[in-house]
Design a protein with these regions (language model features):
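A conserved beta-strand element that flanks and buttresses the S-adenosyl-L-methionine
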Residues: 108
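Conserved acidic residues
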Residues: 105
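Class I (Rossmann-like) S-adenosyl-L-methionine-dependent methyltransferase catalytic domain
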Residues: 1-44, 49-102, 119-131, 136-209
Length: 209
């Protein structure tokens, strides 16, 4: 399997070597919430990591399901939920294999896609397509981290650079409704940026027309 393994991520969380972790939910979460773009519903957080967004969503009244295949990440998210005196459904499973019992109204995608080697992006987007109900919203924060090796064709990460041309190919307009650019740039403490985009999931009938 290309890219980092479960053991790689487990060691990172156990050693607290998680430089991508802001220490809090992304400021974009508060922006979406305050504007009404994101409102309480059944929401999935794949690749939940340390669970900052999981806690923030649960506190805001969402019915949250948090998904991660790393035991230490699930344990940390559980600890933070207990500390915050709030609740969410925690699922330890591989995002490329897990099947939901019912579709979700929304998905909060921030740290899963950029943690996966690009070889697995298509399979992951297929899972997003299956998890999200028609008309549901994908709240995406796509990592922008162009590395020097890219000029020589190297694929470097994690986190992997989420090129917007690649995102348009992965999320075609036949299945996903895109808002017009420009998109909000969200600074990261590590000096990276994320692009905030909300996609609407088209119904099969609309997608086939």
């Amino acid at each position: 399997m290309a890219g980092p393994t479960r053991e790689f991520w487990q060691q990172r969380f156990v050693a607290n070597e998680t430089p991508w972790d802001r220490g809090a939910a992304s400021p974009q979460f508060a922006t979406w919430l305050a504007s009404g773009a994101l409102a309480p519903c059944r929401i999935l957080v794949p690749g939940c990591g340390g669970g900052h967004e999981v806690v923030a969503l649960a506190r805001a009244g969402f019915a949250v399901t948090a998904l991660d295949y790393v035991p230490a990440a699930i344990a940390l998210t559980r600890e933070r939920l207990i500390e915050a005196n709030t609740r969410a459904t925690l699922v330890q499973a591989d995002a490329l294999e897990w099947q939901a019992a019912a579709p979700f109204d929304a998905i909060y995608e921030q740290t899963c896609l950029c943690a996966l080697h690009p070889d697995h992006w298509r399979a992951y987007v297929d899972r997003l397509d299956a998890w999200l109900a028609p008309g549901g919203r994908l709240y995406a924060l796509w990592m922008q981290v162009i590395r020097a090796g890219a000029a020589e064709g190297l694929v470097e990460g994690p986190p992997y650079h989420c090129d917007m041309n690649a995102m348009r190919a992965l999320f075609p307009s036949s299945r996903w409704e895109w808002p017009p650019p420009p998109y909000t740039r969200v600074p990261h403490p590590r000096g990276w940026e994320e692009l905030a985009v909300v996609l609407a999931h088209r119904s099969p009938a609309v997608a086939s027309t």
